[in-house]
């Protein structure tokens, strides 16, 4: 019995390690997809943070993670860097963007913030953010990497001129938020499978 338990534990651990390795690969790959070739390092930068359904009254785990990704994605070489927080009141009374803005300030961020508070989908996040990012020389769309690439693809569809300014955010750190990474990779795989049908 003990031997069987050890074997089952080893199998479960191997499966979990394999799943995590797959999720890390998905994040690493998608963090490099749908980028532009015309960003200007040292110029004006807009970091677009895509929101996630949030009941409030404080930012939930996913939105806190996304804000942290947005903050660390800002370039110290940018002449100006603005955080563009996206998301309407989808899961509660307060827009996701406002919840994320509060959290960014709690983390000590004192720089400029622009809020997009009307959107209910990723496509709307991007469409509604366009006026807020149009003057930026470099644009970074961040979330978890498989979600961020969806946002970047929407920008390519809507405004290829702006999409050429897309640069990579810091959204694919090895070993970070493993449960969130696995969930995001599974959602991305299901979405891709549905699109193929």
Q: Where are the regions that the model predicts?
A:
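Hydrophobic alpha-helical topogenic segments used for membrane insertion/localization
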Residues: 1-26
């Amino acid at each position: 019995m003990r031997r069987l338990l050890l074997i089952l534990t080893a199998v479960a651990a191997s499966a979990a390690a394999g799943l995590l390795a797959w999720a890390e690969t998905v994040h690493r790959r998608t963090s490099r997809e749908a980028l532009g070739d015309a960003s200007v390092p040292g110029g004006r930068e807009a970091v677009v943070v895509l929101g996630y359904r949030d009941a409030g009254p404080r930012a939930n785990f996913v939105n806190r993670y996304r804000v942290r990704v947005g903050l660390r994605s800002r370039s110290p070489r940018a002449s100006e860097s603005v955080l563009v927080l996206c998301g309407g009141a989808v899961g509660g009374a307060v827009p996701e963007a406002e919840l994320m803005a509060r959290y960014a300030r709690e983390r000590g961020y004192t720089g400029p913030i622009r809020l997009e508070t009307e959107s209910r989908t990723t496509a709307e996040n991007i469409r509604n953010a366009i006026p807020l990012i149009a003057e930026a020389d470099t644009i970074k769309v961040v979330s978890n990497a498989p979600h961020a690439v969806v946002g970047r693809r929407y920008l390519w569809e809507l405004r290829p001129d702006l999409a050429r300014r897309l640069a990579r955010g810091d959204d694919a750190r090895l070993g970070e938020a493993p449960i969130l990474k696995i969930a995001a990779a599974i959602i991305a795989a299901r979405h891709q499978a549905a699109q193929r049908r």
